[in-house]
Amino acid sequence: MTWLGHACFLVQMDGLNLLTDPVWSDRCSPISWLGPSRYRKPPCKLSELPQIDVVLISHNHYDHLDLFTIRWLGNSPIYIVPDGHRAWFNKLKIHRVIEMKWWDSYSISPIVKIGCLPAQHWSKRTTFDDMKALWSGWGVFGSKKLFFAGDTGYCQGFEQIGDKYGPFDLALIPIGAYEPRDFMRCQHVDPIEAVQIHQDIGSKQSIGMHWGTWVLTDEHVYEPPQKLAQELASRNLDPTCFFALHHGATYHTDWKEEIPTVLETLVSDLDALPQRATSSGF
């Protein structure tokens, strides 16, 4: 499991290489010269990735679905996407696309099944396509159970996911892009709500994502892992049950030694950093 920034992970399990929400462009914007520029560059080149078997897309916002990256990956992987995304891929002459609605599933191999799971968010890529495509999280069910939350606000759907498919061995949960709360609450969880998701789905361990790659909202770029640690402490939870990785760091799920978190190395640097720059029942 390697964090490649924002919501992008390289997941290697059961003989498959999966990518989640891959974005290698500098700006997450419909215009190449306008919009948020990266705070951190990708930790590797696209050409340095292993052969990718499956790409999971959570929704069509530009920080999660990137034209440049998808064009580079081409028709080699299978793309698993929420309902309403197939036409976008087909325009790129990419046809290995599996669309799903919430609670649908698809067997990607004899031992791995992908499930489309609820999230609370929205979709929009142009002026004319508000809410025309679905958004989702994903479950990967094989020798281990993985949950990828995608982009989401907090909702009761996570209790449903936990009741139906928990516990999960590992969860990838957003912890950043949450201020101001009165505007962002319905679409982006904060670290407090992220910990609640961790508990709702019965995650044994979780990794924080959706932070530190672009400065998209008002909180300090390195605040999310601090607030995450504070929330775990306030609930008397083991700090190793939910942690943040360095960009480009790899975490082995069976590794029981020290976990490479970012909090210790970042707290002392904060003052020097800019504040802002198939069917159900699978």
Summary of predicted features, one role per range:
Residues 6-14, 108-169, 185, 189-193:
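Catalytic core of the metallo-beta-lactamase
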Residues 11, 21, 59, 66, ...:
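Divalent metal-coordination and catalytic microenvironments
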Residues 22-24, 59-60, 119-120, 150-152, ...:
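Active-site metal-binding loops of divalent metal-dependent hydrolases
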Residues 219-282:
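C-terminal regulatory/interaction regions
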